[in-house]
A protein has these predicted regions:
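Bacterial N-terminal signal peptides
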Residues: 1-7
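Intrinsically disordered, low-complexity terminal tails/loops enriched in metal-binding residues
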Residues: 12-150
Length: 150
């Protein structure tokens, strides 16, 4: 009986995670199960990195386009994409939107994908970025700062 009680929440979590992954594929255009994600907090902000097999030229181009697009959207204070992927307002985004003029979002290509470097000297913005990245790590089931294959 206890195993049935425990299995129900796990099934709901797995179902919720699959739904998150499906929304992520819709938003990003690539299968997150075949990609590596990082959400790294840094003293002056953080970084979001997404890479896949570098021989998949179309997938790499799609990742780079997505990261470029979110760097521009985030700079404008627009966080609809993470809201859609996670099915809710993502922690930190409200402050990041208000303090958008104090935060830089810089896209860099990487082998197999790219990264968005998030840079600020504003302490409230740094805390918000760290909240945003911590939520991303939790919801995407990324352990610490290690690269994670979904």
């Amino acid at each position: 009986m206890l195993s049935a009680v425990l299995a129900a929440p796990l099934a709901a979590q797995d179902s919720a995670f699959r739904a998150l992954q499906d929304r992520g594929k819709t938003a990003m255009g690539v299968d997150q199960y075949t990609s590596l994600h990082r959400f790294d907090p840094l003293p002056d902000g953080g970084r979001i990195a997404l890479v896949r097999d570098s021989t998949d030229a179309a997938g790499v181009a799609t990742i780079r386009a997505h990261l470029w697009d979110i760097s521009r959207a985030f700079a404008a204070g627009e966080f609809a994409v993470p809201g859609f992927v996670h099915g809710r307002e993502v922690p930190g985004t409200r402050v990041m939107a208000v303090r958008k003029n104090a935060i830089r979002y810089v896209f860099h290509p990487l082998p197999g994908g790219g990264e968005v470097r998030i840079v600020t000297r504003d302490s409230a913005a740094v805390r918000a970025v760290h909240d945003f990245l911590a939520f991303q790590r939790m919801d995407h089931r990324v352990d610490g700062n290690a690269p994670h294959r979904h």
